């Protein structure tokens, strides 16, 4: 098996680099050069493609959300029960019964040793 020579690429890259760089300019001058007029067409196409994919993706999510909301309002017995007011009336009656039951079971037991006595002196800390 013959292993590839990775150093053989370096002279090729060097010649390509020297061909693009002008002899009188430095390496940072390439970054400051203005792009040619034909270079801007592909960037605009790329931006339009990204926006198109984003719009398509967003529209798909929005339509699936709307469709799922429509399915929630079907004639499913659970949804019919939730939409009806009977459970709210039953819940209100149950709550009132619980409050009355708790009020009836409440009582206060008075401890005669802890009842306030105006004649007794309580030292302050």
Swiss-Prot record:
It is a single-pass type I membrane protein. GO terms for molecular function: delayed rectifier potassium channel activity; potassium channel regulator activity; telethonin binding; transmembrane transporter binding. Glycans are attached at residues 5, 26. The keyword Cell membrane applies. One of its GO terms (cellular component) is cell surface. Phosphorylation inhibits the potassium current. Keywords: Cell membrane, Glycoprotein, Ion channel, Ion transport, Membrane, Phosphoprotein, Potassium, Potassium channel, Potassium transport, Transmembrane, Transmembrane helix, Transport, Voltage-gated channel. The chain crosses the membrane at residues 44-66. It comes from the Eukaryota. Ancillary protein that functions as a regulatory subunit of the voltage-gated potassium (Kv) channel complex composed of pore-forming and potassium-conducting alpha subunits and of regulatory beta subunits. KCNE1 beta subunit modulates the gating kinetics and enhances stability of the channel complex. Alters the gating of the delayed rectifier Kv channel containing KCNB1 alpha subunit. Associates with KCNQ1/KVLQT1 alpha subunit to form the slowly activating delayed rectifier cardiac potassium (IKs) channel responsible for ventricular muscle action potential repolarization. This is Potassium voltage-gated channel subfamily E member 1. It comes from Cavia porcellus.
């Amino acid at each position: 098996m013959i292993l590839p020579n990775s150093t053989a690429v370096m002279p090729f890259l060097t010649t390509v680099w020297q061909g693009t760089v002008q002899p009188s300019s430095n390496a940072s001058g390439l970054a400051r050069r203005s792009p040619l007029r034909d270079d801007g067409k592909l960037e605009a196409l790329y931006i339009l493609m990204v926006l198109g994919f984003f719009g398509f993706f967003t529209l798909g999510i929005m339509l699936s959300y709307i469709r799922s909301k429509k399915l929630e309002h079907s004639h499913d017995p659970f949804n019919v029960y939730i939409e009806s007011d009977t459970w709210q009336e039953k819940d209100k009656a149950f709550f009132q019964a619980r409050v009355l039951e708790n009020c009836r079971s409440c009582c206060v037991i008075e401890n005669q040793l802890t009842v306030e006595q105006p004649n007794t002196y309580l030292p302050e800390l």
